[in-house]
UniProtKB/Swiss-Prot annotation:
The gene is rplQ. This is Large ribosomal subunit protein bL17. It comes from Picosynechococcus sp. (strain ATCC 27264 / PCC 7002 / PR-6) (Agmenellum quadruplicatum). PANTHER family: LARGE RIBOSOMAL SUBUNIT PROTEIN BL17M, RIBOSOMAL PROTEIN L17. One of its GO terms (biological process) is translation. It comes from the Bacteria.
Amino acid sequence: MRHGCRVPELGRPADQRKALLRALTTQLIRHGQVKTTKARAKAVRSEVDRMITLAKDGSLAARRRALGYMYDKDLVHALFAQAKDRYGDRQGGYSRVVRTVRRRGDNAEMAIIELV
């Protein structure tokens, strides 16, 4: 039995799932929006919110945690520079998931996750 299933498994082993979420988080912060499956979009939403909350904190420890998670060092510095101005008055909910048409090959539910 799976009591307290907090993390969607996304059909992958733990190491591949963590790498996928890190890559999607990095790409979403870089480009502002990413088209992916609905399950992946919902899973990456909490990771993106966590990174933006760290950036709003702005401390050295928060910066080091973000550098340890995201793949692009320059992107982390840019996020920390603009997060307070862009998200200063918002208490969470930094991204939205918009459903789109299903994927043609396997009929998977697709979504666009974008930063607010």
